Design a protein with these regions (language model features):
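Detector for outer-membrane/organellar transmembrane beta-barrel domains
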Residues: 260-378, 383-384
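Sequence/structural signature of outer-membrane beta-barrel proteins
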Residues: 99, 143, 157-163, 187-189, ...
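N-terminal periplasmic/intermembrane-space "pro-region" immediately following the signal or transit peptide
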Residues: 19-100
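Bacterial Sec-dependent N-terminal signal peptides
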Residues: 1-24
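Outer-membrane beta-barrel "beta-signal"
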Residues: 396-398, 421-434
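Surface-exposed extracellular loop regions of Gram-negative outer-membrane beta-barrel proteins
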Residues: 131-153, 253-281, 357, 361-369, ...
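Outer membrane beta-barrel
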Residues: 79-109, 119-235, 254, 258-261, ...
Length: 434
């Protein structure tokens, strides 16, 4: 089949930088004019142009894209009958930072990782730099008389071994309203997370990616609903003496209901139920504990240059799905009053972020979040109780495809015994997308 090469004009893509939020920017890329080049030099009919535009618009629609995800690419290939298109894109991202305080060596700034014992640190300060976050993606979009619209998506980035190894990030297929593959969990809302430079982000962020089967439908009235079954990933604090990990026997079930007013403002209620197992080595029996979580998230524009981001999550047995607690094993904790038994502790997290656009190409944001673990009485005093995180940043889009930014991060960790320590980070970033 003869292929057609498409080039998205840079002048048209400039529309993206005038958007108020990262959601606006990514959607604006879909509205960019496209200059079409057919290798054979043939002209398109109006019907073919309309078909191409419909497919290109489909290319960018995604309910699960966040600020750090790649934007729409400049380059696409399309079949001669305009029924199949393939886009190739990516980004080159460089981050640098300077830590002040007791932060454990890590690319991501997480309050959980603050070193509570000063004797474990030879120096309070640390300089770091990393190309992690650099990535590539491929998306194929097609249309079939029997299947309707379908798409295949593969994304990888250099976050693997030693933070430079290539690692699969997403790989899924969507046919109509059905998605199957390795994709963002239905229990999450990346679009409601504020812009950040640091790889970790807000310490309550739900950011799980897993193998799933999802049905999602958008209604004309602005409502969207989704339900999925997902492969679970759990983290259980077993000791190998009285308790041990047990195999997974039941998938997670997740769902959300969302109402959107306008293309980039919405409120979403998400939920998840799961089964987390462990082995009681004293009685030699396997037990299952019920886990569940709810997430309320929203983003919108109360004023033209202002964007608000907000999330609130609560649950039991869902700590391994993101945020501060993903650094530990808190889906199940040992019951100190009953050896051999475990329980699912409750956890609460919230985040509020504001973004202000000074100019179409310059914007700033500030965010504050907290995560709290509600462990039972008798938990060791050195265990994590809560963490606080705050950041302020400034971004400049030098061109529609080149972005630079600076950021200040602050974090605090408080243990069960009340002992607390803080850390600070100054970071910078420059990235080019294509």
């Amino acid at each position: 089949m003869k292929r057609i090469f498409l080039f998205m004009a840079a002048a048209a893509a400039a529309m993206a930088v005038s958007a108020q939020s990262h959601v606006d920017r990514q959607r604006a890329a879909a509205a960019a004019d496209v200059v079409y080049y057919e290798l054979g030099g043939n002209k398109y009919t109006p019907e073919q142009v309309d078909s191409i535009n419909r497919i290109v618009a489909e290319y960018y629609f995604d309910q699960f894209r966040g600020f750090q995800d790649p934007e729409a690419p400049y380059f696409m290939f399309m079949s001669k009958d305009s029924q199949l298109a393939m886009g190739i894109g990516g980004l080159v991202r460089m981050r640098g930072w300077y830590d002040v305080g007791y932060m454990t060596k890590s690319n991501g700034f997480s309050p959980y990782l603050i070193t509570m014992d000063p004797a474990q640190r030879t120096s309070r300060d640390r300089l770091g730099v990393s190309p992690s976050g650099t990535g590539l993606f491929f998306r194929v979009i097609g249309r079939n008389k029997m299947l309707g619209h379908y798409q295949l998506y593969i994304e990888g980035n250099f976050n693997g071994y030693d933070h430079v190894g290539f690692q699969l990030k997403k790989a899924y297929a969507t046919i109509g309203d059905v998605t199957v593959g390795y994709a963002s969990s239905t229990f999450g809302d990346p679009a409601a997370q504020p812009p950040v430079i640091d790889a970790q982000g807000a310490n309550n962020k739900i950011s799980n990616t897993t193998v799933l089967l999802r049905y999602m439908h958008t209604f004309r009235s602005g409502w969207t609903a989704a339900v999925s079954v997902e492969n679970p990933t759990t983290a259980v604090a077993t000791d190998g003496v009285s308790t041990a990990a047990a195999s997974t026997v039941c998938p997670d079930g997740a769902a959300f209901v969302q109402y959107a007013w306008g293309p980039t403002s919405h409120v979403r209620l998400s939920g998840i139920v799961r089964s987390v197992g462990y082995r009681d080595l004293i009685s030699e029996r396997t037990h299952r504990r019920a886990g569940w979580g709810v997430l309320l998230s929203a983003t919108g524009h109360p004023a033209d240059p202002l964007t608000v981001y907000a999330t609130l999550n609560y649950g039991r047995g869902t700590s391994s799905m993101g945020g501060d607690l993903i650094c530990g094993a808190y889906d199940l904790l040992p019951d100190v009053a009953d050896p051999g038994h475990m329980y699912a502790p409750a956890s609460l997290g919230w985040n509020l972020g504001l973004q202000y656009n000074f100019r179409p190409d310059i914007f700033a944001s500030a965010s504050f979040s907290q995560t709290r673990l509600y462990a039972r009485e008798g938990t060791a005093g050195s265990e994590y109780k809560y963490g606080l995180w705050a950041c302020a940043n400034l971004f400049w889009n030098l061109t529609p495809r080149i972005q630079a930014g600076v950021e200040f991060d602050w974090g605090l960790r408080c243990n069960v015994d009340g002992y607390a320590r803080s850390a600070r980070r100054v970071g910078a970033m420059c990235q080019f997308t294509f």
